[in-house]
Structure formats: structure tokens, C-alpha cells
Amino acid sequence: MSKVLVLKSSILAGYSQSNQLSDYFVEQWREKHSADEITVRDLAANPIPVLDGELVGALRPSDAPLTPRQQEALALSDELIAELKAHDVIVIAAPMYNFNISTQLKNYFDLVARAGVTFRYTENGPEGLVTGKKAIVITSRGGIHKDGPTDLVTPYLSTFLGFIGITDVKFVFAEGIAYGPEMAAKAQSDAKAAIDSIVSA
């Protein structure tokens, strides 16, 4: 039995293409892998606090006493990291906002990236500590950006996930959604076909 963690990060709730596709992924995965456990975390419905000068102090080893706000941030960081490490497959629904990931997803990463916990520095450079996972990124875009200089989502996510130890990453693209109903329908159809292929593999 595998454990699957789905991270939603769109501010558009049910209108979101990436949310709809991640819901489709869950439906297909449950159909093919009925014994697996699936956890869904909606980072827009339940937002992660923005990392600031106070909160960053909670995530660095120190003997200094923590403020109540820092204690809450550290407890949440511990919870998010434990959840991430406990799952085998990580599904990230990542819409493109202004060429990159959403603030909601970035806030999550800022609390998950902790030296000595999810990565460490060695003589040979940084080493990721979240290993043995597979990641599937479902990314939706209004325009066409794949393989071009305006796609900052793909390289950023590949780099971040690899940095913490997740190197088996597959991407599902839904592009051209803002180009009209016909293009949006094709984007959804192509993305669902890609999801079907991943789920059945």
C-alpha cells in the first residue's frame, strides 16, 4: 500500500483547472489503487503563514526562547515535514501565476525547507533528506509556456524538489487555457490522458 499526498495551491477553488485535474488524479488513482491512502492538503483554503524576520528564527537551531508565533510556525513546519516524509507519492497541483508558482505553494516550501531536517550541507555540497519519493506536478497555465523562457514553474519545482531529495518528478501540463473554450477543453483532455498514463504505469 502506498500513501499519496496531494497539495493544491490555486486561489480559484473549484474554478481552478489545476484543482480539477488533481481531483481527477485522485479519482483515477483510487480506481486503480483502491488500497492506497490519499491525503489532500489545500494550501489556499488553509494557508501557510508567510515567512518573515520573526518566523525564520523559529526554523533555525537556536537556544533563544521562541515567541508564541514562532512556536506555532515551528509546530506547523514539523507537521508539514512529517506529513511529507510519511507519503510515498507527492502530487503538486501548481498553477502558473505571473510565470511562477503561487504564493500559497511558495509559503509551503519555505516552511518545509529546513537545514538538518529536509536537507543538509556536506563536504560534497547539499544533500536532500526527503528520499524514496515520487512526485507528480500538475501545472496549468493560461498561455503556452512549456520549454520556453517564460516557464519558471518547471525548473523551479525540479530544482526545489531535487534539493530536498525528490528526484523522480513527472510533469503534467495544461496549457493555453485562456485561449478560449476549445483550447481549454483540449488542454484538459491532454492533461487527463497524461494523468491516465501515469496512474496506470
Curated annotation (Swiss-Prot):
<dbReference type="InterPro" id="IPR023048">
    <property type="entry name" value="NADH:quinone_OxRdtase_FMN_depd"/>
</dbReference>
<keyword id="KW-0288">FMN</keyword>
<keyword id="KW-0560">Oxidoreductase</keyword>
<comment type="function">
    <text>Also exhibits azoreductase activity. Catalyzes the reductive cleavage of the azo bond in aromatic azo compounds to the corresponding amines. Can reduce ethyl red, methyl red and p-methyl red, but is not able to convert sulfonated azo dyes. The stoichiometry implies that 2 cycles of the ping-pong mechanism are required for the cleavage of the azo bond. Can also act as a nitroreductase and is able to reduce nitro compounds such as 7-nitrocoumarin-3-carboxylic acid (7NCCA).</text>
</comment>
<feature type="binding site">
    <location>
        <begin position="96"/>
        <end position="99"/>
    </location>
    <ligand>
        <name>FMN</name>
    </ligand>
</feature>
<dbReference type="GO" id="GO:0016652">
    <property type="term" value="F:oxidoreductase activity, acting on NAD(P)H as acceptor"/>
</dbReference>
<protein>
    <recommendedName>
        <fullName>FMN-dependent NADH:quinone oxidoreductase</fullName>
        <ecNumber>1.6.5.-</ecNumber>
        <ecNumber>1.7.1.17</ecNumber>
    </recommendedName>
</protein>
<dbReference type="GO" id="GO:0010181">
    <property type="term" value="F:FMN binding"/>
</dbReference>
<dbReference type="GO" id="GO:0005829">
    <property type="term" value="C:cytosol"/>
</dbReference>
<comment type="similarity">
    <text>Belongs to the azoreductase type 1 family.</text>
</comment>
<keyword id="KW-0285">Flavoprotein</keyword>
<comment type="function">
    <text>Quinone reductase that provides resistance to thiol-specific stress caused by electrophilic quinones. Can reduce several benzo-, naphtho-, and anthraquinone compounds.</text>
</comment>
<dbReference type="GO" id="GO:0042803">
    <property type="term" value="F:protein homodimerization activity"/>
</dbReference>
<dbReference type="GO" id="GO:0006979">
    <property type="term" value="P:response to oxidative stress"/>
</dbReference>
<dbReference type="GO" id="GO:0050446">
    <property type="term" value="F:azobenzene reductase activity"/>
</dbReference>
<dbReference type="InterPro" id="IPR050104">
    <property type="entry name" value="FMN-dep_NADH:Q_OxRdtase_AzoR1"/>
</dbReference>
<keyword id="KW-0520">NAD</keyword>
<feature type="binding site">
    <location>
        <position position="10"/>
    </location>
    <ligand>
        <name>FMN</name>
    </ligand>
</feature>
<feature type="binding site">
    <location>
        <begin position="140"/>
        <end position="145"/>
    </location>
    <ligand>
        <name>FMN</name>
    </ligand>
</feature>
<dbReference type="GO" id="GO:0009055">
    <property type="term" value="F:electron transfer activity"/>
</dbReference>
<dbReference type="GO" id="GO:0016655">
    <property type="term" value="F:oxidoreductase activity, acting on NAD(P)H, quinone or similar compound as acceptor"/>
</dbReference>
<comment type="subunit">
    <text>Homodimer.</text>
</comment>
<dbReference type="InterPro" id="IPR003680">
    <property type="entry name" value="Flavodoxin_fold"/>
</dbReference>
<feature type="binding site">
    <location>
        <begin position="16"/>
        <end position="18"/>
    </location>
    <ligand>
        <name>FMN</name>
    </ligand>
</feature>
<dbReference type="InterPro" id="IPR029039">
    <property type="entry name" value="Flavoprotein-like_sf"/>
</dbReference>
<dbReference type="Pfam" id="PF02525">
    <property type="entry name" value="Flavodoxin_2"/>
</dbReference>
